[in-house]
Regions:
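Short, solvent-exposed loop/beta-turn-alpha elements that line the ligand-binding surface or hinge
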Residues: 42-45, 127-144, 187, 230-251, ...
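A structural signal for short loop-to-beta-strand junctions that line the ligand-binding cleft
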Residues: 99, 108, 136-176, 209-210, ...
Length: 444
């Protein structure tokens, strides 16, 4: 369905009155946005002029005008609302929200890990808004993947709406494997094959490494869960227990540090977002494998379509059925104390509608947390995405960001291990001591 470039005055009036539900954008390059109807105008929204401040992950806005199109559509149906978009590096958003809430001037809508911000008391409960939404659209909750809904739920109350979902898979260079006469890591390849492949693929004389590494806690958590370990156990009702110093966790870090010491991968930097370094080195042919996300697959396919890209689920490990990848899901929430809750929730409903979710997947490789994702031919026909879809069924949510001090300590332990400052056991014991000083009891 193409964008309507010309709207008659009558249609425009109906649209502004909330009778029209297509909410088409002005941009001629956004004709795909016609996929899916927008929520109708909420007649209970006051016509009083307001400004809605929205904070988004910069990775979603840096190279796309999708959210600008969303704003144009929203302001057309709600002409009394002026939406201001602000983009920040994902890792900085939780602290910015905390400072804004404490200062009494929070933004109206924020993208982030809703489970964690809700647990820290930084988000408004939205059960009433969800209930009203379900009354007008009984399928409202049913459209979202259950694991993503769990990431916007705290103590049986919803604090946001899921936006996207992601996990880690193995991304590899098929040409490198063929040159080395190695079978592709498909099917039930195991951790020991992965290490052996990294060794064979490492060619110092060609400045090529077998594996890429990062110190980012979320990414390293995939190695921990793959080994059957965990860094935090418990629930909001019963309280949480920090388990950084588990022997299984130390074994996972030892496996990684041993490969780094053996020269099978470059020692990662300590800069924030060092996971971006691995992707660039992979594109440059300097590393043959790394654990990457779905957006990495999209970036490679869209910018270098002839790249010999291979994708596989994570390797099997001795942990067998208790092993998993890491699950990530961002959502949109309303910070504690925000003044325009009703309008903010309407904006959230629009942002998570299929009209924007579909092009978000097509253009950004940020896949919506919708049940149709794993069955839609448009995406399942991309064979490189099949391992990603399958891995979503075997991924564990990362919850350590509930406790920033503990998460920082875990990150420091990873760096200490990778830089041979301490053994994995020593580094994790120190992290356990530091992280244990934070509040881990039952949450309010």
């Amino acid at each position: 369905m193409r964008t309507l470039i010309f709207l008659t005055s009558a249609v425009l009036i109906l649209l502004l009155m909330g009778c029209g539900q297509t909410g088409l954008s002005d941009g001629g390059d956004l004709d795909e946005l016609a996929a899916g109807n927008l929520p109708p105008r909420n007649p209970n929204i006051s016509p009083e002029p307001i400004t809605l401040e929205v904070w988004l992950d910069i990775d979603f806005t840096r190279d796309s005008n999708l959210f600008e199109a969303l704003v144009r559509d929203f302001e057309r149906v709600y002409p009394e609302v002026k939406v201001k978009l602000f983009s920040f590096v994902r890792e900085s958003i939780p602290q910015k929200v905390e400072l804004a809430v404490l200062s009494g001037i929070p933004p109206d809508v924020v993208q982030g890990h809703v489970y964690a911000v809700a647990g820290r008391g930084l988000a408004e409960p939205l059960d009433e808004q969800w209930q009203a939404w379900s009354e007008t659209d009984p399928a409202a909750a049913g459209q979202f993947i259950d694991s993503a809904l769990a990431e916007v739920t705290w103590k049986d109350k919803r604090y946001g709406v899921p936006l996207d979902i992601y996990t880690l898979v193995l991304i590899y260079n098929r040409e490198h494997f063929s040159e080395a006469n190695l079978p592709y890591p498909e099917g039930d390849y195991d951790l020991f094959y992965l290490r052996r492949a990294a060794e064979i693929l490492t060619e110092p004389e060609r400045d090529r490494y077998g594996m890429g590494f990062t110190t980012d806690p979320w990414y390293v958590y995939a190695w921990v869960t793959g080994a059957g370990g965990d860094v935090l156990v418990g629930s909001p009702e019963e309280g949480f227990t920090l388990t950084l110093d588990q022997q299984t966790n130390a074994d996972a870090l030892r496996f990684l540090s041993d490969m780094i010491e053996a020269g099978y991968g470059p020692r990662p930097t300590t800069r924030p977002r060092d996971y971006e370094d691995r992707r660039q080195m992979f594109l440059d042919g300097q590393i043959s494998m790394y654990f990457g996300e779905s957006q990495d697959i999209h970036l490679i396919q869209s910018t270098q379509p002839d790249f010999p890209l291979g994708v596989a689920q994570l390797p099997t490990t001795p942990a067998r059925d208790s092993a998993a990848s890491v699950l990530g899901s961002s959502g949109l929430f309303i910070p504690k104390g925000a003044q325009h809750k009703a309008v903010a929730f309407e904006f959230i409903k629009w942002a998570t509608s299929d009209r924007y979710a579909v092009p978000m997947a097509r253009r950004l490789g940020r896949y919506p947390a919708k049940n149709w994702l794993q069955t839609s031919p448009e995406f399942t026909e991309n064979l490189s995405l099949i391992p990603f879809f399958n891995q979503l069924n075997d991924a564990r949510p990362y919850r350590l960001d509930l406790f920033p001090l503990a998460e920082e300590a875990f990150g420091d332990a990873i760096k200490a291990t990778f830089y041979d400052i301490a053994t994995p056991a020593e580094a994790l014991q120190a992290a356990q001591t530091i992280g244990g000083n934070t509040t881990l009891g039952p949450a309010p």
